[in-house]
């Protein structure tokens, strides 16, 4: 983390790290005097105290000094997080003044049945229900079938789906300034192609971010 903060490329890009809960406190402390920001990978859908052994609340995350939170990741959805549960988490996180990175995306079955837009519409409508404004919301488009598989949609497919997301947000919140990231098997080999998509604002990087050299290579190729 410190090496990245000292990189000459740091000034040209914004970095948000979302480590496991057990490392949140350490990351917050190590990045305190840098411009690197820290986020959590999830939170519980109830914010108060109660019989929720093993869970962590948005309030607890905020108290650590964390500023961001990923919600709706496909792996959490596969563990049982419905759009309704994700919506509760979003509303709680926004109340705690956390900046939400909401993940949306279709499965391989959805793609084969050409239901990508329908899926995105349902996820966005349900997950953002009762949200009054899009402030502190970032959308990450992550096709479920692409995560960790090495398979990546074509640039045209990503552009089309990101365009839909941006138009949806613009219509819902009367604001076109929404940040949309792409996530799904992003690595140093395909970043040169992916960065050509002119309507995405950044990347949600998974496995490749765990290796310093690979990650810096991605950053270099994104900026140059």
Question: Where in this protein do the model-derived segments appear?
Answer:
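Active-site loop-to-helix "anion-binding N-cap" substructures in soluble metabolic enzymes
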Residues: 1-224
């Amino acid at each position: 983390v410190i090496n990245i903060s000292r990189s000459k490329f740091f000034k040209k890009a914004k970095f948000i790290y979302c480590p496991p809960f057990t490392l949140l406190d350490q990351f917050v402390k190590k990045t305190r005097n840098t411009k690197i920001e820290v986020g959590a990978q999830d939170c519980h859908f109830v914010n108060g105290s109660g019989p929720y052994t093993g869970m962590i609340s948005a309030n607890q995350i905020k108290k650590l000094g964390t500023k961001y939170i990923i919600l709706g990741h496909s792996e959490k959805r596969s563990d049982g997080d419905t759009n309704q549960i994700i919506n509760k988490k979003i509303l709680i996180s926004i109340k705690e003044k956390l900046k939400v990175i909401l993940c949306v995306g279709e499965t391989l079955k959805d793609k084969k049945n050409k239901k990508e837009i329908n899926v995105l519409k349902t996820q966005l409508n349900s997950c953002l229900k009762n949200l009054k404004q899009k402030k502190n919301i970032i959308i990450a488009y992550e096709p479920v079938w692409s995560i960790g598989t090495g398979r990546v949609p074509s640039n045209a497919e990503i552009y089309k789906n990101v365009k839909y997301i941006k138009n949806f947000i613009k219509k819902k919140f009367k604001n076109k300034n929404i940040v949309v990231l792409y996530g799904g098997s992003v690595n140093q080999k395909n970043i040169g192609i992916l960065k050509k998509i002119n309507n995405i604002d950044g990347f949600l990087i998974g496995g490749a971010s765990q290796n310093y050299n690979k990650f810096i290579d991605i950053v270099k190729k994104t900026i140059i």
